[in-house]
């Protein structure tokens, strides 16, 4: 039977109900039972939405309190010893403590590391494996959710992260050892999970093995056959799910594994289909991921249907239809958007619409095109409208792109010359202290922004309130003793949305939220057309901030690669072309800041690494245009203007040459959660410019001690000469509260002062 299904659904709710419930619980304003009830109601609603849209199977286990990888750590009993001994099951507060470093009723402890989920803007909590790691069933959450869905009579397909991907995504702690050596101990527990699902009456289980789209070492490839052969008996039928890219040289391996079904991503890698079909066995089900799970563009139903009709000829009823990946990366429901203009809205589809597209494709295939004729006609009209719209292409932007030359990608002189000029002009001390940019977004700030957008206060009053917040941030930083100040970004709701709102070619949603990590949600803008800057975007705020202090204030911009990566990007031209348009816009803004006497300008690129293709063979091309775009944005200034950049959550030891090629005068990086591991890159590669390794983890409310910060700086000094070291947090302080910010920054400044006088 041809089946319409889904790999995963957004968790947060149409009105971010999960976010508000979690944060109330963490503040002890909501009890645990009330939190559990909120999440139970959300799950039931989401299952109902998917079933009513026409799906034959709805996912269970895709919902998470915080993160699906952390869920697997809890399920399998992978709890680091510092969180205490787990007697029976991992309780909810231990779970939150692993993610955040604190939870109601728990003492503060270092949180587990957090990093990017493949090449997305979602973050997962990294499993920590000990050399003699024991595994056992330590959570009933998945089984309870299965029972919930069954009690409501939903047709279900539980979702698990596969054993090889779970090990691959974790880190060895303690002594260095091969994570793969843990597989034999892990597999019996997976077997228990599958057996228990079988006893619950589950017919199909989805096992996600996204690492099959990566370059895998031979021993990991060999482990797949061993692992899945051991899981053949005693469980439900297994659908092996891959996404975010092509199987490539893992195609034969994936096709021949002893499982009953295979899901492939035909949006990010449509070219892989022919090779998969060549290797595909006659007994196996193929799930075709034809609806884009990561972007917001409406599906071309005619094109997808033509592909499915050809597949049905080959596979008959062994064909399933699905989004390309989990809809975790998509906003919830386009119906919640009332402010988008109708033309643009007709080009879009969010999670609810995407499952409707999946169901429509299945109905067309099974019942005939006539049954869904209106849906097909609407889809065709939307495709034609988008191709023909005059709002997408701007001739003057196309002309400027052709004028970009190599001189526009180079500073006037190399770093050693620039550094001497900057030392003379900026007169900064050894171990200069600064922050990454944002300060706490208080309820008053958020209210002022809401009131201004809603028209409840006029622009002069809004500006007065924002200037008061800027003054507060400047005064606070002066009192802490920081050397280079920032204006605090009170006027910015989001580091991408703020800029996009001032650029033509961008559109914005009211409720297009997607989960970044835990309760943290982002609302990516939509880049639908050529990008144009109407006027300076940050100059007035920075000029005001600089007028309040004799110390230097850093300008703060979001870089072209990050603007690209953290937006929903048009798919009608190469991403490199869109990035160049963004770089040209930022080049103009950087020069305007310099003209306004802002002599330190930070161009943030926290998403630089996440743009990397998953296959290494494709890295060179990406890095070439990403570096070029950054340099176009940042190279139009005088030697005395110091260009900073910032990267967070980045493991970029293997792209350190590209990082150096950015030629930023100063780079600040995240190192605190990973115990400074990132600095090992500098043992083999002497980074030529200045660097600020983050000395405390802003994502955890735990404040470090002065001794801890001194230790991190001393460790950094083993790789970087002291005269090229900066002292800073590892990320912006937007999500923190002022009391903890004050304590942490005073401690950080004290550590720097102590080292100067040592």
From Swiss-Prot:
GO molecular function ontology, one term from the record: zinc ion binding
Binding locations of 5-methyltetrahydropteroyltri-L-glutamate: 16-19, 116, 520-521, 566, 610
The EC number(s) this enzyme carries: 2.1.1.14
Biological processes per GO annotation: methionine biosynthetic process; methylation
InterPro entries: Cbl-indep_Met_Synth_N (IPR013215), Cobalamin-indep_Met_synthase (IPR006276), Met_Synth_C/arc (IPR002629), UROD/MetE-like_sf (IPR038071)
Entry keyword Methyltransferase: yes
Residues binding L-homocysteine: 436-438, 489, 604
Record keywords: Amino-acid biosynthesis, Metal-binding, Methionine biosynthesis, Methyltransferase, Repeat, Transferase, Zinc
Enzymatic class: transferase
Entry function: Catalyzes the transfer of a methyl group from 5-methyltetrahydrofolate to homocysteine resulting in methionine formation.
Name of the protein this chain belongs to: 5-methyltetrahydropteroyltriglutamate--homocysteine methyltransferase
Organism expressing this protein natively: Nitrosococcus oceani (strain ATCC 19707 / BCRC 17464 / JCM 30415 / NCIMB 11848 / C-107)
């Amino acid at each position: 039977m041809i089946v319409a299904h889904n790999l995963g659904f957004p968790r947060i709710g149409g009105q971010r109900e999960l976010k508000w419930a979690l944060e109330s619980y963490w503040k002890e304003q909501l009890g645990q039972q009330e939190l559990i009830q909120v999440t139970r109601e959300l799950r039931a609603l989401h299952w109902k939405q998917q079933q009513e849209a026409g799906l034959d199977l709805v996912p269970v286990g895709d919902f998470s309190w915080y993160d699906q990888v952390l869920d697997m750590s809890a399920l399998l009993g992978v709890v680091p010893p510092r969180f205490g001994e787990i007697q029976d099951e991992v309780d909810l507060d231990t779970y939150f403590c692993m993610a955040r470093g604190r939870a109601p009723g728990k003492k503060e402890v270092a949180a587990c590391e957090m990093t990017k989920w493949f090449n997305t803007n979602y973050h997962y909590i990294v499993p920590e494996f000990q050399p003699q790691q024991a595994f056992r069933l330590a959570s009933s959450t998945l089984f309870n959710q299965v029972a919930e869905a069954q009690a409501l009579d939903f047709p279900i397909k539980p979702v698990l992260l596969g054993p090889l991907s779970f090990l691959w995504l974790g880190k060895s702690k303690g002594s260095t050892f091969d994570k793969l050596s843990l597989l034999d101990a892990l597999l019996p527990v997976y077997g228990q999970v599958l057996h228990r699902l079988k006893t619950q009456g589950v017919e199909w289980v989805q096992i996600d093995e996204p690492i099959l789209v990566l370059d895998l070492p031979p021993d990991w490839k060999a482990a797949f056959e061993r692992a899945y052969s051991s899981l053949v008996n005693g469980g439900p039928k297994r659908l092996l799910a891959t996404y975010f890219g092509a199987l490539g040289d893992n195609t034969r391996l994936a096709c021949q594994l002893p499982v009953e079904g295979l899901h492939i991503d035909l949006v990010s890698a449509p070219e892989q289909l022919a090779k998969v079909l060549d290797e595909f066995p006659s007994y196996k089900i193929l799930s075709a991921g034809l609806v884009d799970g990561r972007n917001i563009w409406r599906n071309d139903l005619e094109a997808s249907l033509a592909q499915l009709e050809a597949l049905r000829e080959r596979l008959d009823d062994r064909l399933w239809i699905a989004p390309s990946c989990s809809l975790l990366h998509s906003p919830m429901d386009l119906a919640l958007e009332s402010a988008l203009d109708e033309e643009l809205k007709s080009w879009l589809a969010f999670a609810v619409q995407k499952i409707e597209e999946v169901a429509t494709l299945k109905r067309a295939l099974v019942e005939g095109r006539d049954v869904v004729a209106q849906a097909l006609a609407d889809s065709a009209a939307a495709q034609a409208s988008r191709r023909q719209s005059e709002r997408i292409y701007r001739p003057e932007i196309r002309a400027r792109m052709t004028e970009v030359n190599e001189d526009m990608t180079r500073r006037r002189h190399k770093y050693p010359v620039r550094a001497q000029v900057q030392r003379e002009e900026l007169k900064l001390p050894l171990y200069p202290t600064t922050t990454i940019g944002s300060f706490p977004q208080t309820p008053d700030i958020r209210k002022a922004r809401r009131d201004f957008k809603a028209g409840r206060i006029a622009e002069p009053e809004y500006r007065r309130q924002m200037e008061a917040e800027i003054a507060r941030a400047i005064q606070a930083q002066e009192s802490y003793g920081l050397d280079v100040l920032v204006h605090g970004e009170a006027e910015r709701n989001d580091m991408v949305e703020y800029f996009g709102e001032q650029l033509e070619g961008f559109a914005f949603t009211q409720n297009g939220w997607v989960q970044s990590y835990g309760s943290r949600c982002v609302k990516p803008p939509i880049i639908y057309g050529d990008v144009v800057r109407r006027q300076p975007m940050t100059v007035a705020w920075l000029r005001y901030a600089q007028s309040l202090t004799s110390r230097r204030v850093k300008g703060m911009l979001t870089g072209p690669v990050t603007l690209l990566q953290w937006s929903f990007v048009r798919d009608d031209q190469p991403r490199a072309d869109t990035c160049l348009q963004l770089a040209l816009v930022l080049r103009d803004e950087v020069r305007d800041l310099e003209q306004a006497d802002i002599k330190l300008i930070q161009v943030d690129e926290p998403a630089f690494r996440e743009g990397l293709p998953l296959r290494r063979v494709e890295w060179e091309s990406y890095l070439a245009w990403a570096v070029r775009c950054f340099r176009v944005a940042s190279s139009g200034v005088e030697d005395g203007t110091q260009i900073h950049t910032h990267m967070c959550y980045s493991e970029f030891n293997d792209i350190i040459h590209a990082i150096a090629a950015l030629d930023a005068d100063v780079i600040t990086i995240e190192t605190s959660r990973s115990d400074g591991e990132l600095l090992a890159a500098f043992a083999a590669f002497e980074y030529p410019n200045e660097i600020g390794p983050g000395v405390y983890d802003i994502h955890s409310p735990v404040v470090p001690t002065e001794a801890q910060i001194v230790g991190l700086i001393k460790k950094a000094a083993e790789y970087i000469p002291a005269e090229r070291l900066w002292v800073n947090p590892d990320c912006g302080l937007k999500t923190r509260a002022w009391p903890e910010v004050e304590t942490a920054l005073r401690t950080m400044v004290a550590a720097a002062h102590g080292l100067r006088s040592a």
